[in-house]
Structures are given as structure tokens and as C-alpha cells.
Design a protein with these regions (language model features):
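Bacterial N-terminal signal peptides that target proteins for export
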Residues: 35-45
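C-terminal segment of classical bacterial N-terminal signal peptides
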Residues: 49-60
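Beta-alpha junction/loop-to-helix N-cap segments that form part of ligand/metal-binding clefts
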Residues: 63-67, 81-85, 100-181, 193, ...
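Periplasmic-binding protein-like
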Residues: 70, 137-150, 168-172, 218-222, ...
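Extracellular/periplasmic Venus flytrap/periplasmic-binding protein
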Residues: 129-132, 177-178, 186-296, 338-340, ...
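Extracellular/periplasmic ligand-binding modules, especially the Venus flytrap/periplasmic-binding
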Residues: 283-288, 336-402
Length: 474
């Protein structure tokens, strides 16, 4: 029987449940391939609305299912090389987690017993739009946490909102060091489960100093926003320490992000005297630049140091310029597929190729790594909580300063009060193997995280300008 009090509450709530259906309609429009996932989230969305209006929802709901919001580029220039592989890696790892198919130590079903639902949504549109999206996912859908974010600009925009809304957020990919060095110096809810851009620049400088010590200089072409600026700054400062004989140009090229056309910049690079060219281009910008540069013989005249070229390697195939120094922002993508022989990498690579018909790249690994970080933290917290579903504070405590195994590398949450990940790194030279029919890397050097990341408590610029004291490179 339903008493009068309950009837009154239901009469108040039911008209408002249109909020849920409207939100799901918008989600389905964002990515029609995700319809079945969106529809399965209806129960969770209703629970969030009921809770908002003061109707108690049993703990069993939370234990049975958790919802992770996963932002990535589904449209625009960031989608083909970054966003879609990130989405694919997310879908693969979550499906396997729910079925208990991930190799040890993640071979239990679900996350702390809960099946995982993912709301994968479009990161395109800029910072203001993404702040709105973030608020909507928390306040209207009641998601448990976020895992993802490709763009440094997006991370810079949503960091304060994540702390304001007290929502656990694991940055999987965005690279700017500013997140914890300037924007959120005492983070609670925000984590990053991989190294930041300083590691890329320092590892590359070590590689250049070792392999290209006789080069006459270096210049750069980088996107004119946080990621590009930080990438060039850190590489340039590291070169001043590790290879002061190789001089950097002050006349680098700074096109806006997603510019798409680089005729003037390519002309300037062809005229520049420096042997080496640094670029942190990614996504559609990287591929457009490569095609335009190939047409003008740019890669035959300069040696390119490409910190994110690993994302484009399999897409470009034979058209990937031979001889570029290729980065994948860690031991991900081509480095893991070719060089890391562990049960986890073998499983992930085989499952990804079987499902999507292509090799997993850097963002596929990084997004899966963030999801594994969530599984690790929730299950560690649940174990400490007597097997009960943990609170957000308990999950945070479990992840702070912890070490967990990603798909391709160990992740140590060892910087920024235990919120910034530290991982190993790799650099090598790319070419195309005709027999394999795949791009490969050779002359590879590996770098430990403590060699290429600032010690805890020291910001990147201070560390680099001070001669990188405390780096452990033995």
C-alpha cells in the first residue's frame, strides 16, 4: 500500500523526471553508438533525482552499479587520432572489468562489486562548454566520478569546478603541469594518472643530448595554448641544462590550435638554419601538418622531434615520415605494442585489435589506465571499509600517494600531495616495416620517472632553471 505521504512525494517528483529523459536524449544525440549505455543509465539517473528531492535510495543501488563520466573528443580535429581511440580503450576496459576478463591484479568482476556504466561524451567546444557539461553530469545525472580529458585547456577549465562540486576526477591524458603547480596546489578531488608535459620535454632533451649531440640547433612549431607553450618551455629549459652546446631558436612558430593550414609556418621552418624541430602538435593538427610538410619535402631537410606522433603512427602508416623522433607521452601505444611483453599488454593489444581492427595508441592506453586507477582505488577503499561501498573521501585516501599497475606501466601517485602520477618514459626513431605492414620504433631509450619529473614540492620551471637538482637518472 502507498500512503498519502508517499503519494504526495511521488506527485511532486514524477513531473520532474522529464529532466532525466531530456538529459538522456541529449546524450544519445552526442553519440548514437552509445544508446544502449545511455538507456541502461536510466535507473541511476532516476536515483539521482530521487535523492535530490529527499527520497532515500538504498545502498544496494550504489553497490550494484557505479557511473563514470568519460569526456573525450568525439567530433572535431581531436577526434580521429585522440578521442576515438580513447573512447575505444574506455569501452574495452570497462566491458572487460564488468566481465572479470582483465588480467591480474584486476581480474575480479566490476569495481568493488559494482558494475560500471560509462557516459562517454564529447569534449569539443572549449572550456566554458566543458564546465557546463561537467556540472550537468554531476548535478543532473549524479555520476560517481570522471575519468578522461584530452586537452590541457579543458583540464585547466574544469579543475576548479571539480573541487567545488567535490567530485572525484582522474585526468587521464591532459599534460599541462599548471594543473597542480598553479591552478590547484592543494588538490583533494582531482588526480592525474600519468606524468605531465615536463616529463616529455626532459626525456626528449636527454634523448637529443645522447643521439644528436652534434646538431647545430633546434627550433619549434607548437600550438599557441597551454599544452604547446608548456611543451616548448620545458624542452627548451631542459636542453639548456643537458645540451647547452645546442642552441635553441627564439623564432619558433606558434599557430593557434586546430588552425589546419601551415603554409607560412612550413616556409619559415624550411628557411630556418636549425637541424632539429620540436613540435607537440596532436590530433588533426599533427596529421594536417605532416601531410603538408611531406608535400614540400620538410621531413627530408629537418629532423623532427614529435612528442605526440605516436597517436598518428598507425593512422598514417606508410605516410609516417621515416626518421622522426617519436613520442607517445610515456611507454604507451607503439612502445607498448612493440616492446612490452607482459600479460596485461598482450591481452589489451589482442583484445583491441580483435575488436577495432587496428592497434591501440597512446590515448587508448591512457584512458584505460585511468579506469584501472579507479578500480584500484575503490577496491582498496572498500577493503579498508569492511567490504562496504566506500565514500568519496575513502577512495581519495586510498589513491593518494599509492602505486598501481596501469596497462603498460606502473603508476606512482608521488607528486602534488599524492595526486600527480609518475611513470616511465620512452623515445625512439620511427620507420615503417614493410614485412610487418606497421610503423615501428628503433634506437629506443627508456627513462625512469624520477629522472624526468621534478621532485615533489618543486614546480617544473623552478626545477628546470635550477639545473634539475634531485633528478635520479642512475
Amino acid at each position: 500500500m502507498i500512503d498519502a505521504s508517499t503519494t504526495s512525494v511521488l506527485m511532486f517528483i514524477l513531473p520532474r523526471l522529464t529532466v532525466v529523459s531530456t538529459t538522456f536524449s541529449l546524450f544519445i544525440q552526442e553519440d548514437k553508438n552509445m544508446k544502449h549505455r545511455a538507456l541502461r543509465l536510466a535507473a541511476v539517473g532516476v536515483a539521482a533525482v530521487l535523492t535530490t528531492f529527499g527520497v532515500a535510495v538504498g545502498n544496494a543501488v550504489a553497490k550494484d552499479k557505479m557511473v563514470i563520466a568519460v569526456p573525450t573528443f568525439l567530433t572535431g580535429g581531436g577526434a580521429p587520432a585522440f578521442g576515438i581511440p580513447a573512447r575505444n580503450g574506455t569501452e574495452l576496459i570497462i566491458q572487460a572489468i564488468n566481465k572479470g576478463q582483465v588480467p591480474a591484479p584486476y581480474n575480479t568482476k566490476g569495481i568493488a562489486g559494482a558494475q560500471v556504466e560509462a557516459i562517454i561524451y564529447d569534449e569539443s567546444g572549449g572550456g566554458a562548454k566543458q564546465v557546463t557539461e561537467y556540472r550537468n553530469k554531476v548535478q543532473k545525472l549524479g555520476v560517481d566520478m570522471f575519468a578522461g580529458f584530452v586537452s590541457s585547456g579543458t583540464c585547466a577549465a574544469v579543475t576548479a569546478v571539480a573541487e567545488e562540486l567535490k567530485t572525484l576526477t582522474l585526468y587521464s591524458t591532459c599534460g599541462t603541469p599548471r594543473v597542480f603547480e598553479e591552478l590547484d596546489k592543494n588538490p583533494k578531488y582531482v588526480f592525474r594518472t600519468m606524468s605531465h608535459a615536463t616529463a616529455d620535454g626532459v626525456a626528449l632533451a636527454h634523448y637529443v643530448a645522447s643521439k644528436y649531440g652534434s646538431a647545430n640547433g633546434y627550433t619549434g612549431i607548437n600550438q599557441n595554448y597551454a599544452w604547446g607553450q608548456d611543451s616548448w618551455r620545458d624542452f627548451d629549459l631542459a636542453m639548456k641544462v643537458l645540451a647547452p652546446n645546442i642552441k635553441g631558436s627564439t623564432k619558433g612558430q606558434w599557430p593557434k590550435i586546430f588552425a589546419g593550414r601551415y603554409g607560412a609556418e612550413i616556409s619559415a621552418l624550411l628557411k630556418s638554419p636549425e637541424d632539429l624541430v620540436h613540435t607537440s602538435f596532436w590530433g588533426g593538427d599533427l596529421e594536417a601538418f605532416i601531410f603538408q610538410g611531406l608535400a614540400r619535402g620538410l621531413f627530408k631537410k629537418k629532423t623532427f622531434l614529435m612528442s605526440v606522433a605516436g597517436t598518428a603512427a598507425y593512422r598514417l602508416g606508410k605516410k609516417l615520415p621515416s626518421g622522426i623522433v617519436l613520442g607517445s607521452r610515456g611507454p604507451y601505444g607503439i612502445y607498448a605494442n612493440q616492446l612490452i611483453d607482459t600479460p596485461m599488454v598482450k591481452w589489451f593489444n589482442n583484445a583491441y585489435v580483435n575488436r577495432y581492427g587496428t592497434q591501440p595508441t597512446q590515448p587508448s592506453y591512457q584512458y584505460a589506465q585511468a579506469i584501472l586507477g579507479a578500480k584500484f582505488a575503490y577496491e582498496k577503499a572498500a577493503a579498508a571499509n569492511g567490504g562496504k561501498w566506500p565514500s568519496t573521501d575513502q577512495v581519495i585516501a586510498a589513491l593518494e600517494g599509492a602505486t598501481f599497475q596501469g596497462v603498460a606501466t606502473e603508476v606512482r601517485m608521488a607528486r602534488s600531495h599524492g595526486h600527480q602520477g609518475v611513470t616511465d618514459h620512452a623515445w625512439g626513431v620511427a620507420s615503417f616495416d614493410k614485412e610487418l605492414g606497421l610503423p615501428v620504433v628503433s634506437d629506443v631509450m627508456h627513462f625512469k620517472g624520477d629522472c624526468i619529473m621534478p621532485p615533489d614540492g618543486i614546480d617544473s620551471v623552478t626545477w628546470l632553471k635550477g639545473g634539475m637538482k634531485g633528478a635520479k637518472c642512475d
